[in-house]
Amino acid sequence: MNIILLGPPGAGKGTQAARLVEHHGMRQLSTGDMLRASVAAQTPIGIEAKGIMDCGELVSDEIVTALIDAELTAMGPEVGAIFDGYPRTAAQARQLDAVLAKHERKLDRVIELDVDEDELVRRIVGRYSCANCGAGYHDEFQQPATRGVCDKCGSIEFKRRPDDNEQTVRTRMAEYRAKTAPILPHYEARGIVSRVDGMAPIDQVTTAIEAILAED
């Protein structure tokens, strides 16, 4: 099975992808992660990409497609793929169709995690983590048992991501909607788009996704 998970930053795509990997033995294909790994390993694609990024330019769709092509080859046909946050443009959607066809795979389902923008801002702006072990917390939803002390390691040092602010979140939401709008009709015409309430509790989101996949 091959699926696409769509949703803005903070919608929970990574969490749900990790659960699909655990439950179904699928492979999560995050283009950002693949790009960083390719650069670190100094593969031919990684070397080319690094040269482009060092010049302050965006990596081309062709390089991203080549990364996906290489990953699908390494995976083998028996392993399902989860495309996390990709494709992001109509051109990328067409290129993904081509590379899947090359590997004799079909796209089974596109799942969009729907979120309320104001609630998403609240969710992201309030989050922080332990500077020592990385345990995640939230100002409203998940405080440490002892205020100011990490539950897992006892550290008293915490940190927040600099881009976890309202302006950045709303800008990313606007960008996501602008880019995703032309992608969805590409897949809706095939009848493979499903939407899940991304603001529901994590376990409920997982259950909803599993129910959708069980239909395919």
Question: Which stretches of residues belong to each language-model region?
Answer:
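Glycine-rich phosphate-binding loop of ATP-dependent small-molecule kinases
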Residues: 1-216
